[in-house]
């Protein structure tokens, strides 16, 4: 069985790919990367609606790539962003309603 690369290794490879393709230069507008992310989210939603696991896997991966590149364009790492989100949600109170977790301030 083929072993998957860890997320940190993949982030480094994606960063090198993005740099090689000019996505990390000062002339690039991060807003364009955000538009690419929205496109990929749409494709991911389509895969989910049509119950296509292979396309869903690809879509989720594409979204992660877009987020990694967007973070790097702003001089941040995906780990830094994820840690900030974790610190915000780890003690969050709320409840599950209709399959979604709603924080207590939204109830």
What is each stretch, according to the model?
Residues 1-60, 64-107:
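Flexible "arm" and connector segments at domain edges
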């Amino acid at each position: 069985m083929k072993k998957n690369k860890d997320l940190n290794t993949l982030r480094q490879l994606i960063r090198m790919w993005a740099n090689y393709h000019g996505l990390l230069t000062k002339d690039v507008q991060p807003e364009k990367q955000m538009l690419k992310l929205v496109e990929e989210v749409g494709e991911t939603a389509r895969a989910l609606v049509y119950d296509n696991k292979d396309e869903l896997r690809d879509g989720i991966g594409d979204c992660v790539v877009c987020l990694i590149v967007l973070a790097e364009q702003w001089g941040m790492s995906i780990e830094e962003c994820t840690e900030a989100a974790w610190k915000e949600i780890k003690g969050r109170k709320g409840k599950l309603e209709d399959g979604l977790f709603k924080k207590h301030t939204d109830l």
